[in-house]
Amino acid sequence: MSNYVERCIELCKQKNPGELEFHQTVEEVLSSLTPVIEQQPEYEEAALLERLTEPERGVTFRVVWVDDAGKVQVNKGYRYQFNSAIGPYKGGLRFAPNVYPGIIKFLGFEQIFKNSLTGLPIGGGKGGSDFDPNGKSDAEVMRFCQAVMTELYRHIGPNTDVPAGDLGVGGREIGYLFGQYKRIVDKYEGVLTGKGIPFGGLLGRSEATGFGIVWYAEEMLKANGEDMKDKVVGISGFLSLIHI
């Protein structure tokens, strides 16, 4: 590992204390880039790695909503817009009780590279809230999503940042978010992906990631002169990829 990479990893840990998930992914990614960095000294001069590991913008906001019992609830919301070098920020929204800046930064940082590999002009970002949708009624989820979008709408747009779903955020939640966005800005535009078919969504969207994993695995095996026949597949964490 180059001295420059080591310094950047340590700097990231110092600037983001206690965010272990973010530390881990930064260390893994930057370590893998060492051969490239050593061959391109101009990257260090341009502080490329420092810029990659620092979000272009980070927003933390309060989400106030009312539950079915009429009690006011308060959650935290986040949106980290990591990198827009090749296009608008793109990345999901996660609703889970363990969501905090470290997880959102970890996911947003990885999203830069995942999106660039598609060949599409999209940057990387991620967002979410510590809201737990489990056990909540449809009406509670709707009110929460509306409260999120009431703050989030000012930070997103079809040419700025296009969120999607993630853990705890499926077609229902995207629909509630999109409805509130339209209500506020009075425009029907491509600001969220993962919508239902009646609201401009795409057929096969929910299955796309799962199929993509299989096709990607097939291509990796093919590149090494192998195929899927008789292979044993281990699945560790599938979130919303599996539909029964």
Where are these regions (language model features)?
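Glycine-rich Rossmann-fold phosphate-binding loop(s) that bind the pyrophosphate
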Residues: F238
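Conserved small/polar residues in nucleotide/adenosyl-binding loops
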Residues: I242-I244
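Short helix-loop-beta connector
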Residues: E226-D230
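Hydrophobic Val/Ile/Leu positions in short beta-strands of Rossmann-like dinucleotide-binding domains
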Residues: V233-I235
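N-terminal ligand-binding/catalytic initiation module
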Residues: M1-L203, E207, Y216, M220-A223
